[in-house]
Each structure stands twice: as C-alpha cells, then as structure tokens.
Amino acid sequence: MKMKMKFYYLSLSALFIFLQSCDNEEQEQIETNVVEEIVEEEVDPFYAGINENSTLDDYWDLFVKDAIRSGKADPGFGRTINLFFGSEPDFASGVTADHAGRAYDICNDETVSFEIIESFWEDFSIVQRLYTFYHEAGHARYKYRHPYEASEVTSRPEEYPIMWLSMAAENSTFEEFIKDKNNFFKRNWENVRYFNCSED
C-alpha cells in the first residue's frame, strides 16, 4: 500500500510539473505573439525603409512622399536640393546649442538648402532624425519659423510641434512623431509663423 501511495504521489507530481511546463510554454508563446503584434503596430510600413544607414537624400525622398500623401501640392519638385552635414563650429554665428541644423536661402523658391550637424545626427535615434529633418525641411521648403523666439517663451508648451526645436527629446516615440508630423503638414500648431520673404 505504501508503495502504491508513493507511486501515486510521484505520478501526480510528474503530471503537475508537466502541466505547469506546458502552461509556461503557452504563456511565453502568447507573450511573444503580443510583443510581435505591438512592434508591428508601431512601425508604419511607409517609414520601414529608413534605418541607421539612410542618407539625407533618403530622408528627403521620404519627406517628399510624406508631403504628397499628406496632401501638400508641391513638396519641392523642380527645386535644387542641397542637403549636407555641417559641424558644430559652423554654428558659432548665433545659433544656440539646442539646434541641430540650419536652413539656408529660405526665400529662394528655386532651392531647398539646409545642413544638419553630423555629430548630433550620428547620436540621434531614427525618431530624433525624423524630427530634425522635418524641422529643417519645414524652414527650407515651407518657410516655417519657430512658433516663438527664445526671448518670448515664458513657459513650456503642453505639446512641442516639429517647428518648436530641431532636437527632439531622446525618449520621443514614433507615435508622437506621426502625430506631430501630421500637424506639421496641416499647419496645425499654436502660433504658426512664416519667414517674411516679400521684397521691400
């Protein structure tokens, strides 16, 4: 009888361990599937071609396609495009350390020209690169100005539009970029301003 009880308890223990093991494998599979679904939802296939090795020209091509799909009639066709990397000393002429780029020749309707500080770009995540690129393209192509000058800012806004700063926070998410980018193309942010390019 004692032997039967031992066998019974051993069998019961083995069954419990087997069922627990199956439950853990099933739980891991469910968790893996959920994580994969979340990752797939976060990456818009439109941006899938951009990676750590993408060039400024790749970002420009993406910007143009994005502008078109957002309803912009002329994202810059027929213009001379001049995108390049600069270095920090290039910015010694009054541009502050919270800027990662600079637009040139903004009032010339035949060009789109801007530079991005290469050392910043190399350290940026893809989301930060998207923010910086769209910010500088906003100056160079659409003549957007920053919503406020530094001297006018008395408190931080609740939301930071793409044209607020050319350097997005490290923890900026892809979802935030998509929302801000949509507002960017719709000109939907507080205090939209343009460079004055009228000839006096």
PLM feature spans:
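Bacterial Sec-dependent N-terminal signal peptides
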Residues: 1-35
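Metalloprotease/metallohydrolase-associated module, dominated by Zn2+-dependent proteases
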Residues: 22-31, 35-63, 69-76, 97-106, ...
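Acidic helix-start/capping segments at beta-turn-to-alpha-helix junctions
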Residues: 77-93
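Active-site-proximal beta-strand/loop segments in catalytic clefts of secreted hydrolases
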Residues: 84-89, 118-119, 136, 164-168
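Short pre-active-site segment immediately N-terminal to the catalytic Zn-binding motif
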Residues: 115-133
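Active-site recognition of the HExxH zinc-binding catalytic motif
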Residues: 130-144
